[in-house]
UniProtKB/Swiss-Prot annotation:
This is DNA cross-link repair protein pso2/snm1. InterPro entries: DRMBL, Rad18_UBZ4, RibonucZ/Hydroxyglut_hydro. Its EC number is 3.1.-.-. One of its GO terms (biological process) is double-strand break repair via nonhomologous end joining. GO terms for molecular function: 5'-3' DNA exonuclease activity; damaged DNA binding; zinc ion binding. The gene is pso2. Zn(2+) binds at residues 109, 112, 126, 130. Belongs to the DNA repair metallo-beta-lactamase (DRMBL) family. Keywords: DNA damage, DNA repair, Exonuclease, Hydrolase, Magnesium, Metal-binding, Nuclease, Nucleus, Zinc, Zinc-finger. Pfam families: DRMBL (PF07522). A zinc finger (UBZ4-type) spans 106-135. It is an enzyme of class 3 (hydrolase). GO terms for cellular component: nucleus.
């Protein structure tokens, strides 16, 4: 494959902003039981063995230039207003500050399998070049001996362990380590269902006969390589395309499932539902019999909850005995607005700027390897423009089975007013450098950093956030005026932050969990510290208490 003309784009977007100018647990069970049954307490919500296993919950694998873990779940900065000019500047992320777990796992390239720890080039660039069939640097494939703890000799795989946990996991003389004992409990399905979800970093897991992948983001497929041979991988059709044609996993192991259809897999009824996260993202519903009674499990993967989920025939008016919940934003401060509002605001802002000047405007939208395409598409349609992407991104998008998006793409950056790029951040200085590449075609540039961390609630909403009634009755709204520029923006170069997320907001989580008949909720994100778990348990218990006392929330006349 020929060398990409815009291969230096990553360098542009790693620069910091120095500009001076400014722009205008498990929740208590609520199944039908004897009225004298007392709800579980927070203290007993998580067992000590579960807490021990949670140390392995963060699989930080920066692959495919995909910041899905670091920018959405930890290291992306929040923002605060600067003076009275409605400008934003970075604010230290309180969630990161309070998080006690500092997991640092061994990073492996999913294509060639080498360790990425000692590369002199950016790890993301190396992986991207591997995807394009090129290698940026000759490196040894031999892993560091002190970076891996081997499992049972009968299991040919190894699994990465953080330095802080290594000593505690070294086997005693004559003892073997059971791989299953170090897999986070929330990745293993209950009721003797022999399935694991998003658990590819642990080799062959004892008792697991099938592996499920919720979506194609690196914090979920981490550990999966072309050499995978530990069992069938069940996923959506789009995710299957990506595994086979992008990651080159052996097709015999990839089992692509259609949405909304029942499958009998090893005696378990399985449904795949659209998770409303990134293209191909899936929620899994598992149904099994236990003591002649149906037990139903919902694993949400990463999802943006919506009314469509609650009203789905597979879930509507059903008892969901266990829900494995994406708790990325289980905090009242993250009651950010609906996707559609933010997408429209971004498009309206681009139109307003375009109409206010005779300049040739270039719009840059930050995306993941997959995900957040909706923003770029809306802007492109509003400007009657095509969308430029690099060859690697083009190849990935062609696996998504979205012909409308494919028809908008071009590999000529001068023929598109919208550029969709994968990067770690957008700042005025880096945008200026990017503009200089194409100064013969464009003379003004704006960029959008789209992430839920950017949302700042109104003061009165923050004060009312402790009331469930207030949360339910005050759905967040968002318009063009609410878009704020990052400090350092000028008339020529401006960077905006938009509270667009493909994870559920706190409002979404509240509506979802109050309107469904849920037995137990098991968080799958931010479970690495006792403090974080206790904070989440407060809300899980409040939701459960409300369901028990007031019944399920009706969505009949709710616009959500």
């Amino acid at each position: 494959m020929s060398k990409r003309k815009s291969s230096s784009i990553l360098d542009f977007f790693k620069k910091s902003n120095n500009g001076k100018n400014m722009w205008g647990n498990e929740a208590v069970s609520v199944e039908k039981t004897d009225s004298t049954t007392k709800p579980s307490t927070v203290k007993n919500a998580i067992s000590s063995s579960q807490i021990k296993n949670e140390k392995f919950s963060q699989e930080v694998l920066l692959q495919f230039n995909d910041p899905s873990f670091t920018s959405e779940v930890g290291e992306s900065p929040q923002w605060q207003s600067f003076g009275d000019a409605n400008i934003l500047e970075p604010l230290k992320n309180e969630l990161v500050k309070n998080e006690e777990s500092t997991m640092s796992e061994l990073l492996l390239c999913p294509i060639c399998g080498i360790t990425l720890e000692s590369l002199t080039v950016d790890a993301n660039i190396h992986v991207n070049d591997c995807l394009d069939g090129r290698t940026t640097e000759a490196v040894s494939k031999k892993l560091k001996k002190d970076s891996v703890v081997k499992a049972d000799p009968s299991n040919s795989s190894t699994f990465p362990i953080s330095d802080s946990c290594k000593q505690a996991l070294l086997p005693l003389p004559g003892k073997q380590i059971n791989v299953r004992s170090v897999v986070p409990f929330y990745k293993l399905m209950p009721y003797n269902i022999p399935f694991a979800v998003d658990a590819f970093a642990y080799g062959a897991i004892d008792g697991v006969e099938a592996y499920f992948l919720s979506h194609f983001h690196s914090d979920h497929y981490g550990g999966l390589t072309p050499k995978w041979k530990h069992g069938p991988i069940y996923c959506s059709e789009v995710t299957g395309n990506l595994l086979i044609n992008v990651m080159h996993v052996d097709e015999q192991y990839v089992k692509r499932l259609k949405l909304n259809q029942p499958y009998n897999i090893m005696g378990i009824t399985v449904y795949v539902l659209d998770a409303n996260h990134c293209p191909g993202s899936a929620m899994f519903v598992f149904e099994t019999l236990q003591s002649n009674q149906t037990r139903r499990v919902l694993h949400c993967g990463d999802f943006r909850a919506s009314k469509d989920h609650v009203m789905h025939p597979v879930l509507r008016e059903k008892t969901i005995h266990k829900v494995y919940l994406d708790t990325t934003y289980l905090n009242p401060k993250y009651t950010f607005p609906p996707q559609a509002d933010v997408v429209q605001a971004c498009a309206d802002k681009a139109i307003s700027i375009k109409k206010s000047t005779d300049s040739r405007l270039l719009v840059v939208v930050s995306t993941y390897s997959i995900g957040k395409e909706k923003v770029a598409v809306a802007i492109a349609k509003s400007l009657s423009s095509r969308i430029y992407v690099v060859p690697r991104k083009m190849h990935i998008i062609k696996q998504l089975e979205n012909q409308d998006l494919i028809d908008l793409l071009t590999d000529d950056p001068t023929q598109a007013s919208v550029h969709m790029v994968t990067m770690m951040g957008i700042h005025p200085n880096s945008l200026l450098d990017y503009l200089e590449q194409y100064n013969s075609s464009f003379d003004k540039i704006i960029g959008y950093k789209v992430t839920g961390w950017t949302f700042q609630p109104l003061e009165n909403r923050a004060q009312l956030s402790s009331s469930l009634d207030s949360i339910i009755s005050r759905p967040p709204k968002f318009v063009e005026y609410d878009l704020r520029a990052i400090r350092g923006s000028t008339d020529k170069v401006a960077a905006f932050v938009a509270p667009y997320s493909e994870h559920s907001s706190f409002y979404d989580l509240t509506m979802f969990c109050l309107s469904m008949n849920i037995g137990h909720i098991i968080p799958t994100v931010n479970v690495g510290s006792q403090r974080s778990r206790e904070k989440m348990n407060v809300w899980l218990d409040r939701w459960a208490w409300r369901r028990k006392k007031q019944g399920l929330l009706s969505l009949e006349n709710v616009d959500w």
